[in-house]
Amino acid sequence: MSKDEAATPPASFDDFMKIDIRCGTVVEAAPFPEARKPAIKLVIDFGPEIGIRKSSAQITEQYSPDTLVGKKVMAVVNFPPRQIGPFMSEVLTLGVANERGEVVLVTPDSYAPDGSRLH
């Protein structure tokens, strides 16, 4: 485990419950050449309660835009929007580093409806 991956200080269950992590389906994906680090712009459908949200994800080593449309992803939907260059990212799409340090997306391993909350 690298120093960047070291465990963070303990959090309470109440802290965890403040983070709203939902399942969504990528409906659009496009290159994001204006980003400082290689990234892909995502448009994600989180169902009728949350709706469509945008995200920038640094996932170009493992994915191309055409492979992402239709893919289920997990994202934090209640962080404030963040300006990434000329793009406003509305959710934080979740991923983990593989053995080569490349980010791979966190996805449900079987069907989950759009908008489903992580428990």
Question: Where are the language model's segments positioned?
Answer:
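Phosphate-backbone binding interfaces of nucleic-acid-interacting proteins
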Residues: M1-H119
